[in-house]
Amino acid sequence: MLHALLGYAQRTGLHAEPGFSPQTIRWAICADDDGNYLGVVPLGSDKKGLAFRLLPTQAQSALVGKGGVRAQPLWDTVGSVLLWSKDEKRKPPDRERHDNFLLLLRSATEVIPECQAAVTLLSDPDALGRARADIEKQGPPAARPEDKMTVRIGDRLLVDMAAVPAWWREHYRALQKARESTGKSRGENGAMLDLLTGDVVTPAYTHDTKIKGLAGIGGLPQGDALVSFDKAAFTSFGLEKSRNAAMAEESAKRYAESLNHLIQTNGRILAGAMVVPWFKEGVAAEDDPFTWIVEAPEHTARIAEARAAELLEAIRKGTRPDLAGNRYYAVTLSGAAGRVMVRDWIEGEFEELAAAVAAWFTDLAIVWADGSALASPPKFMAVVGALVRELKDAPASLVAELWRAAARRKAVPRAALARALGRARLAFLADESPRVAGLALIKAYHTRINSWGYPAMQPYLNENHPDVAYHAGRLLAVLARLQYAALGEVGAGVVQRYYIAASQTPALVLGRLIGNSKNHLSKLDGGLSFWFENRIAEIVGRFGDRLPRTLDLEGQSLFALGYYQQLAHDRASRPAAKEEAINA
């Protein structure tokens, strides 16, 4: 995965220089060329601030260490720049950080003369007091001590000065050499082979660029570590911290910035987890099978199989060389107490992905509950939603397994089958139509898990299905409609009273229900009674020697599918002359 991320950075030209990172600055304290205070102004056209593609940056681990609290170069938090904090505990570290901010400004004055005016401004207690009073008046939204701030001298921001990158590169290298000389970066282990490039390097002591964008799924707002060894149990051979996965600082930053960029552009949150897909070579949006799975508006989902077949044929004929040999990658992530949890990682050929997505929609195809037509192909999140009461209840691990089933043409997880069955059963007992995506997933499970899956598992009713459990479900559907035709609404009917028992112990229950059906048949006129009698006999004839005494999870799910498809079939094909009489 890390090699794929490094390749993405190289292919896209993603800038990942140590000591620089994207930042968004919300405020600027302003002064003239002599350092006289002029005011505080917001930056950017929106409430978030002004985004910079690359600014000089120190890693969080470098800001707090044995040398005391340090500041960011030429920008920092409002609390430290203005000594503005409502929390008494924050005032000492903010003062220390403010002093370090001034120290960095002084070190830059020879290269960036405007920094001298900034030093004059921020060393003046009266100017700082006026700035604190002014910033408290800003908003909405109101300023916060943790907002980021820089200095504007005249009409130019310090961070925008042309000499800044060269000054910071030299200063940053000096800082790194100082850390190496104290052993914090080099330690006793010396040079090592870079895990990603194979070069001989001085490995980074920690990987300081955090993975951001996972705050809503267990991560921290400030980011989480992907490669981390902060416990002795995680280390080997006496290596400390991230030397257990030795990489130069540049390599560590490249994989982190690549993943951050992919999260921002491609990441999709799917019920407690984030799926981040990409391709080795760029793929147009209309050719992206991942989009078909996740977003799948109806018109897209309906043509997904045809589009996949078209792309596959083009690859085989050589008319789409851009797709032939292309590879896909997808990582499923969530946050966990400051660390990134990699829940799944898949990769493969584009051709395999297109075929898998086409099969996903084919296997999910199922009739509407009214039997009128095939249901619209469900979005991925509709499938997940059919397994739980609310999407937030979906386990991230289950979402990852379902994603793998869709993208890799793997078996539907058994845990998903159990949940889909439970939700469908509740709907049947309440005399409601179940979520069609749940029944579709049950069908897909059996399509992929059984040797007879593909010919037997049809979108519509299959009267020749090879499994008795399926026909047992069909029989209960017919008996329920027979009761309604004979008695009308009776409150708790056959389904409410016997569905659970019949789906678990069919031999014990269905025989008794067949015997009781004679009472219902006697209440119907001859033609309708004969019609129902033939239906019951036809289904019973599928049982063979005997009904199973008990049904396991797979059998109960086939029972539910047979029940559903029989109801859909009858609703669509009931005899016109008897429509009202047998309508349930």
Residue ranges and their predicted role:
Residues Y205-N244:
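Short microdomains enriched in Cys/His and/or Lys/Arg
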Residues T197-D199:
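Short Cys/His-rich metal-coordination motifs, predominantly Zn2+-binding knuckles/fingers
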Residues E188-A191, G223:
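Residues immediately within or flanking Cys/His clusters that coordinate Zn2+
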Residues T202:
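Surface-exposed, flexible loop/turn segments at secondary-structure boundaries
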Residues M1-R186, A232-A584:
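Conserved phosphate-interacting/catalytic interface
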